[in-house]
Amino acid sequence: KVFNYIPELDKSKFDPEADYFYITYNNTIYGTRYTTLPDTGNVPLVTDISSIILSEEIDVSKFGLLFAGAQKNVGPAGVTVVIIRDDLIGNAMDITPTMLDYKTHADNDSLYNTPPTFAIYVAGLVFEWVKERGGVKAVQEINEKKASILYDFLDASDFFKGTVVPKDRSLMNAPFVLPTEELNAKFIKEATAAGFVNLKGHRTVGGMRASMYNAMPIEGVQKLVDFMKKFEMENK
């Protein structure tokens, strides 16, 4: 098997003595996403939400810690958002550097060191933009529409093929392939010439990958699908 699905996780397989369990909520490389969270009992669940923060509603109460780099949906790189349960703060090992101790930042209102002010300012603008669109719930509805436009086409096509098990598909990153590597290369070249950039799949996976982060409008996804239909007609 390959990493194109989220495995079923049986609670009995989790060690109750573990310090924490970790998942990547949305895998940008393989295009998978957790739709059902593992039941870890009393052991804290930790997750990276860098690629889905602000894109869908998340019940943060189910986690011990969530963290996200800003660079996908929040703003320029340089800011990390951390949501941590109060009882998990202040338990750092003695060898933990000051800057890597969450208590340092919690006690100093995230101002222990000089913050990246411009990146934080841009993040604030993005937060206001999300609120103006109706909040995260409204943004999620838009993202679901975008994803359905692309996935519906992939499911109906016998030329393009989505690579992820349908129930585990990401709203943000959709990998897909054509029947041959030659066609993959031709599609990427022609798509780039037509103005569709960064469609080449991750180097470890190959094929193509369409990223549909919050800033991508529905119209952008529809134009991509229209181009894919044209390419299919001309090359099938």
Where are these regions (language model features)?
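PLP-dependent enzyme catalytic core of the Aspartate aminotransferase-like
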Residues: A193, H202, G206-K236
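Active-site C-terminal subdomain of aminotransferase-like
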Residues: A70-Y151, V165, E234-K236
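A short secondary-structure junction signal
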Residues: Y5-P7, G31-T36, S55-S61, A77-T80, ...
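Conserved PLP-binding catalytic core of the aspartate aminotransferase-like
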Residues: F160-A191
